[in-house]
Regions:
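N-terminal secretory signal peptides
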Residues: 1-7, 11, 15-24
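Early extracytoplasmic/lumenal segment of secretory-pathway proteins
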Residues: 32-94, 98
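Extracytoplasmic ligand-binding site segments that recognize negatively charged/polar headgroups
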Residues: 42-49, 86-223
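A ligand-binding cleft/hinge motif common to bilobed small-molecule-binding domains
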Residues: 95-101, 220, 225-243
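Short beta-strand->loop
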Residues: 107-115, 127-130, 226, 242-254, ...
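Periplasmic-binding protein-like
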Residues: 135, 197-202, 240-264, 300
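A bilobed periplasmic-binding-protein/Venus flytrap-type ligand-binding module shared by bacterial periplasmic
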Residues: 138-145, 180-183, 257-269, 276, ...
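Mature extracytoplasmic/periplasmic domains
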Residues: 263-322
């Protein structure tokens, strides 16, 4: 019975996507002991299917169905579902999280329902959800090809610029990196133009310009030897035998947090809290930190791996963070400008 119900629900989700909306989704019911949670395609999906799905079944007898969707696709489907959420739990980065809060698609969150609340740093749970993974963004480089860059401006100088892999504002790490680069040339949180102008000057020298998802492959293939990225990507490539190291820029590494949220109108709130409690628990966080997944944990009882860029989670409070409420309204125009001016 359960398999049929969830399969039908996901089939309708896929069908609604093909038809350009999720209007077919209202009224789909869960089987007892089930939960549908979104996940990011790729490493997130692989990790959660391998680790979290079986653990949740074993611990709480909940059948977890993963729906792989990028952040804005999650929000779009939830808004189109007209109050009958196609899934019960979202996973989002800072920018989309604010869009979703403004769109009213989350249930209010009660962190006291998590038995592991005391195991995560203060402020990692709020009225809307809980942080489940940390991200640290800086510069990756091939130590056999180029010396370690010291800061963002080095990326526009020799020998780094001719080996640079450049990507735009489509991702959180790309947006954050270009903002920090722009600050070195007089730009600001809401004005990346000075940085874009400098990039345009050296564009003919840049090794590769591509979509964010393509950058790890380009680096692995040797088509670029320097890029801005997160520690998870660096650890994953290193695990594949790629010559790659991570450096924190002199002006500071960037940090942000990936959060999970309970969908407004879900009938599976109790199961959702059990799922979130498991995700931030020591066992899951420790398993996710290991290769080949290389997540940065949020549970204070999990010792950080030696190759992490900090000794403990408290250090991240000193890292650069951005106000996505100010970035979001401007980001679409930035993406358009980058795609127009930086295409090679």
């Amino acid at each position: 019975m359960f398999t049929r119900n969830v399969f039908t629900r996901r089939s309708l989700l896929a069908g609604a996507t093909a038809l350009g909306g999720a209007s077919l989704l209202p009224g789909i019911a869960h089987a007892k002991g089930s939960l549908v949670a979104t996940t990011y395609p790729g490493t997130w999906e692989d990790a959660y299917r391998s680790i979290v799905v079986p653990l949740l079944k074993k611990k709480d007898d909940i059948d977890l169905e993963m729906a792989p969707l990028f952040a804005m696709d999650q929000i779009g489907k939830a808004k189109a579902s007209r109050g009958a959420p196609p899934f019960d739990v979202f996973v989002l980065d800072p920018g989309p999280r604010i869009v979703a809060i403004q769109g009213g698609i989350f249930e209010k969150f009660d962190g006291k329902k998590l038995s592991n609340l005391s195991k995560i740093p203060d402020g990692f749970a709020d009225d809307w959800g809980v942080c489940v993974s940390a991200q640290v963004v800086g510069i990756a480089y091939n130590p056999k090809k180029v010396p370690a860059p010291k800061g963002w401006t080095d990326l526009l100088k020799d020998p780094w610029v001719s080996r640079l892999g450049l990507t735009g504002f489509q991702t959180t790490f790309g947006t954050s990196s270009i903002i920090e680069l722009s600050k070195q040339f007089g730009g600001s949180l809401t004005n990346p133009d000075p940085g874009l102008a400098e990039l345009k000057k050296v564009l003919p020298k840049i090794a590769a310009v591509g979509l964010p998802a393509a950058m790890p492959g380009l680096f692995q293939q040797g088509q670029c030897d320097v890029m801005y990225t997160n520690t998870q990507t660096v650890a994953t490539l290193k695990g594949k035998g790629v010559d790659i190291e991570f450096v924190k820029p002199e002006s500071g590494a960037i940090s942000f947090y990936t959060t999970m949220h309970i969908a407004k109108g879900t009938a599976e709130s109790a199961n959702a809290y059990k799922y979130l409690d498991l995700v931030v628990g020591k066992d899951v966080q420790e398993a996710l930190m290991k290769a080949p997944y290389n997540f940065l944990p949020v549970n204070k009882d999990v010792p950080l791996a030696p190759d992490m860029p900090m000794k403990n989670l408290d250090e991240m409070a000193s890292y650069v963070q951005h106000d996505w409420a100010k970035i979001n309204p401007l980001r679409a125009a930035w993406i358009e400008k980058f795609n127009k001016e930086m295409a090679k």
